[in-house]
């Protein structure tokens, strides 16, 4: 029981730390202090690090995390902020786990499509109600979901991706 109690405390402290960080980032976005530390960044390496970091954590929760890539064909180095990009990947993976329902599986893929790198994260949950889909990237929007969270993460992700001249799309 002590071990289980410690596991719960660690998980909750991680959740609260993430929420505080999201609130701080939201505040920085609002007052213009949100900056990128741009350097040559291997986009797929950052994605692979996030997948690797979450794979074991998800496995412990009974969620399979699968990753596929055509990385052998090319390397995608961009001018970007590796920490912010990894933050996007981690936030999206966390959302997929929270909202994946009984699907218990998340698929991540990375591929070059025309002149863009396309990264897809797919969960097998019930999806977002169609009437809520246009609002999910708005700050503080939580919709009808009962899942934990601040409603800030996807808005921050959208801003980070936009500042990297990318697009952040969410669909069912």
Locate predicted features.
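Short conserved segment of the HATPase_c
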Residues: 128-140
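Short helix-loop "hinge" at the ATP-lid/N-box region of the Bergerat-fold HATPase_c
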Residues: 96-97
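Short alpha-helical Gxxx[C/S/T] motif in the catalytic ATP-binding
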Residues: 153, 157
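Short alpha-helical segment of the dimerization/phosphotransfer core of two-component systems
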Residues: 11-16
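Short conserved segments within the C-terminal catalytic ATPase subdomain
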Residues: 57-68
């Amino acid at each position: 029981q002590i071990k289980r109690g410690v596991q719960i405390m660690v998980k909750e402290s991680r959740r609260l730390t993430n929420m505080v960080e999201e609130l701080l980032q939201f505040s920085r976005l609002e007052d213009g202090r949100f900056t990128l530390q741009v350097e040559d960044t291997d986009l797929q390496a950052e994605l692979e690090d996030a997948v690797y970091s979450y794979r074991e954590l998800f496995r412990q929760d009974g969620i399979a995390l699968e990753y596929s890539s055509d990385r052998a064909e090319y390397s995608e180095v961009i001018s970007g902020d590796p920490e912010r990009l990894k933050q996007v990947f981690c936030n999206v993976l966390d959302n997929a786990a929270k909202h994946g329902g009984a699907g218990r599986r998340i698929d991540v893929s990375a591929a070059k499509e025309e002149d863009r790198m396309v990264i897809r994260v797919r969960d097998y949950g019930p999806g977002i109600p169609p009437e809520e889909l246009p609002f999910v990237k708005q700050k503080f929007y939580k919709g009808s979901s009962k899942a934990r969270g601040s409603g800030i993460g996807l808005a921050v992700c959208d801003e980070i991706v936009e500042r990297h001249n990318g697009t952040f799309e969410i669909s069912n």
